Amino acid sequence: MTQDLSDKYYKQLIDLQDVELVEAQIRSLLDVPIESVSDLEKWLKDEKNLMIKIKEALTGHQVDFYRNTEDAEIKSTYLHDQQVIQPLLMKYEAKMNEKCCESPYFNQLDEKRYGLMRRVRESKVKLFREENIPLMVKEQELCTKYSEIMGGLTVDWDGEERPFPFIQSQLDHLDRTVREKAYHAMMSAHRQIKPDMDAIMDELVQLRHQIALNAGFENYRDYMFVAKNREYSVQDCYDFHENVEKHIIPAWNRLAEVFKSKLGVDTYRPWDNTAKLMKNPPYSEVSALMDGVSEMLGKTDPYFADRFDYMREHGLLDLGDRKGKSPGGFCTSLPVSGDTFVFANFSPSFFSLIALIHEMGHAVNGYLEFSEHGPIEDYQHRMEVAELYSHGMELLLLDKLDRFYPEEEDFKSAQREELRRAFTMLYGPLAGDLFQHWMYTNPKHTAKERDEKFFEISKRYGLNPVDTNGLEEEIGMSWAGTLHYFQVPFYNIEYSISMLGALQLLENYRKNPEQAVESFKKGASADYNQSIAAIYEETGVSFDFSEPAVKRMGEFLEKVIQDIH
């Protein structure tokens, strides 16, 4: 029986400090003879059982580090994983992929069950180059450095040192002077770390470009499309950018005029674009946040609340803000335990409430998948699917925001704010996607050119209706606050694609709430070996980001917002 080396929220069934043991267990798989289809299926099962043990330990160490970037022992464990274990895994993963793909029984595997796995393995064999391993290790080291810098970022606020998320939360404030003060404080903090951010990003762009060249690609963008096994093309992305600019941005401009009028301001500045019209914050203590979200989930479906309460009881939620904690929020799976963990570093605000609901969409999806199919492997976890259920959960709970905003006007404002967020998810991630297309197809760009391009794209999309006069430099450098550009490149457009699906789910919910919730659960527990389109269909929506689809959902969203007024 394997001993659990951890008393934490994750199971540590393999000692990653014992590198010889880890290597021996992986190598033993390579020595197994495969003489039939059933042998290959058993080999795949044994490989999965070993890999999920390793993955759970790696995930636990990573979450530990994000929870406390200043703990030397935790950091040492995490860096050992990045510098020693990950390179070992890359090397042996390539060997196992070759063994699998070269087997004469590989193409005899059942297409429905193994088709996606076959395509992913073939892509990985095509992409693998041993000379890229040290480059990828260096890439991870730079991402770790980014987390450390951002985790340690504090801002002086009224003579008190406050974590960066607290300052971000002040952008919600009803008082315009507070919002403007918070905006400039954030920009000042960005300016202080800008040289470090530029140095990290400059090196990341060059590393990633070299990784792509080594693998036989012209640029990192093209490499990543293969690495992500995308079910759409580069041209599809460019068309999506164009269609959103054509149909969503004009609607966003009209909506901005409404918000500007409600705020009673003559000019619509960046700190007005963040304002919330309801009383803030919606809670003061994390316990109150959890109590309220549990109720909202329970009113939507008892299973949703059951999973949330279970996570709360078992230490699978870390939601408060503190110094030394990595920025952002995420949900990650623990494949041996069959659990999910939600991490968030946000101060009390409307956004932190929505962020928790969003991550619980991921968590519910994870629990449903595990209960139906067991541990999901990385290749099955496509973000176009995952984000459908996180955005979908936000919109299924839209009519329950009165739990935090009991006064009618505040409740209406909160609903409008969530729908405004849906608008931002249609154009914001697309702007980030376009920015990265430019960065990685122009790898010799300078830091100054990068800032200028970011401002230009921001002005075309989210800041189109905003008066940015005199703030061009500050806005240009603000890309550095987005962890996706550093840690998960080209993980942007998935948010916008999935939001189109989530809006269809809301449309269905407004017609038949019970049926829409059942469709959510059906899709969230679907066989992930299917195509993205098939999983969307099981959820009762279409995987469609064509011009007619963008136009239709933009019109629907604008009408729903108008109906609330």
Predicted regions and their residues:
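A well-structured
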Residues: M1-K279
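Glycine- and acidic
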Residues: L127-F128, A185-I193, R230-Y238, D272-P281, ...
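Long, well-ordered alpha-helical segments
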Residues: M201-A212, F217-E218, D222, L255-F259, ...
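Inter-helical turn/loop segments and adjacent helix faces that build the functional surface
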Residues: Q235, V258, K262, T300-Y303, ...
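Post-HExxH zinc-binding segment in Zn-dependent metallohydrolases
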Residues: E242, H247, Q380-D410, E418-R420, ...
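Auxiliary, metal-adjacent structural segments of Zn-dependent hydrolase domains
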Residues: K262, D272, K276-S337, S349-F350
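C-terminal, non-catalytic "cap/extension" segments appended to globular domains
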Residues: W271, L356, V364, K400-R403, ...
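Active-site recognition of the HExxH zinc-binding catalytic motif
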Residues: A344-F370, E387-S390, L395, F435, ...
